[in-house]
Amino acid sequence: VQIALADGDGLGDSWAQVLKCLSEFQRLHMIGTGAKTSSVFFPASSEAPSPMPQASAKGAAPSKAVASSTRHAHSVIIQPTRPRQSTAGGGSREHAVAAVDLAAVDELNSATMLDKVDVVAIDRIFSQTEVLSPEAIVHFVRNLCAVSREELASPTDPQVYALQKLVEIAYYNMSRVRFVWARIWEVIGDFFTEVGQHANLNIANYAVDSLRQLSKKFLERGELQNFVFQREFLKPFVDLMGVATSLEMKELIITCLDNLVLTSARSIRSGWRPMFEVFSIAATDPAASVAEPGFHVRLTLTLTLTLT
């Protein structure tokens, strides 16, 4: 943590190891505090997920440090006991025992983590990315996307810690010089397009809604004449609408853009183009719940922009 805070500009692709550690710290922190894991909010089944907290925006209060006056002598156990394979009849019992062993190790590690790791310092790693050099922030974002990809790969226990941090990073760095921001968003935007196609629809929906929140914040900044940053920012919506097979996903994309039109129309410039592309795709969809709102919004926008 201290190396990341002091020498972030020089870490390069070594950010991968740092961010993997932070992801593991977060997992142990949730175990130690009894918090619900991501799998509760993003079940792989068709069951409705529990209400998920909104991704943190810039200016949100950081996590509180976990204070403790007691210091333990033991250190984190890096290699936990692994389940053993067996062909004997008692195999299932051995697996159950091994699972208990792993749970005990996690409990011990989480207690050590709560006692030794400064959670506020971890938050500063992300909030201070706005002062990283142009090259360093791109390295940071690429490696955070890679860690998020690993977290989301589990079919039974996906984690969204790194994905939530990507949303925060986008907020923190949105005020950078535009050509630097364009490099950052090229990486983040492509990753949101990827996660928006996740097999777990709950995760895919979360990614699209996070994209909506970021888009609203970005559009509020306005756009100078002859620039097309809004068009690039909203491009993931077009890409996702073109490949979406889920009716729910298509409806969500339409709803997100409709919301952006209602809240940010005065600030939109080059962003109109990807919006029209999405609504045009929707207008030809065989599902009425997608085609009708897509057609009506497109028609309304055409008439409004023609008359103004």
Residue positions per predicted region:
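Alpha-solenoid helical repeat scaffolds
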Residues: 6-7, 172, 176, 217-224, ...
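HEAT-repeat alpha-solenoid elements in large eukaryotic scaffold proteins
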Residues: 1-2, 112-123, 140-147, 155-173, ...
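Eukaryote-biased feature marking scaffold/signaling PDZ-domain proteins and nuclear chromatin regulators
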Residues: 198, 248-249, 270, 285
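Structured catalytic modules that directly regulate molecular switches in eukaryotic signaling
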Residues: 151-155, 197
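Alpha-helical repeat/alpha-solenoid scaffolds of the HEAT/ARM/MIF4G superfamily
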Residues: 4-151, 166, 298-301, 305-307
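Short, solvent-exposed secondary-structure capping/transition elements
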Residues: 9-11, 175, 204
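HEAT/HEAT-like alpha-solenoid repeats
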Residues: 10-29, 140-148, 179-195, 217-241, ...
